[in-house]
Amino acid sequence: MPNSTPQSQLIRAHVFVTGRVQGVGFRYSTVDTASQLGLTGWVRNLPDGRVEAVFEGVRDIVEDMVRWCHAGPPAAVVQDVAVEYEEPEGLRGFEVKRLVK
């Protein structure tokens, strides 16, 4: 479980997904998949049509989630996934955040 893993072994991926990724269940599929993998973080729609997400957890599992983002749920058409790696913040749970205005 990520909560029992030393902080030094955790990573944080900040992801921006471009394509037909809004209105296709991308956020809720992200929550389901990330939660099943035991990751923490959040996901939200952006006004420019992209989806933004943050995943924190053990490196291999975070990388699995980033790979999942390249396909997303069945109705999504992903064109690009940009990933920035940052210092983990020790997030708890996984949630959908409100749209950024």
UniProtKB/Swiss-Prot annotation:
Q: Which reaction does it catalyse?
A: an acyl phosphate + H2O = a carboxylate + phosphate + H(+)
Ordered alphabetically, the record's keywords are: Hydrolase
Q: Which residues form the active site?
A: R27, N45
Q: EC no.? A: 3.6.1.7
Q: Which SUPFAM superfamilies match?
A: Acylphosphatase/BLUF domain-like
**Which InterPro entries does this chain map to?**
Acylphosphatase, Acylphosphatase-like_dom, Acylphosphatase-like_dom_sf, Acylphosphatase_CS
Superkingdom of origin: Bacteria
Which parts of the chain span the membrane according to its record?
none
Q: Which GO terms describe its molecular function?
A: acylphosphatase activity
Short name of one Pfam family: Acylphosphatase
Residue ranges annotated for the Acylphosphatase-like domain, each copy included? 12-98
Which NCBIfam families has this protein been placed in?
Answer: PRK14441.1, PRK14444.1
> Which family is this protein grouped under?
Belongs to the acylphosphatase family.
Q: What is this protein called?
A: Acylphosphatase
Native species of this protein? Answer: Nostoc sp. (strain PCC 7120 / SAG 25.82 / UTEX 2576)
What gene is it encoded by?
Answer: acyP
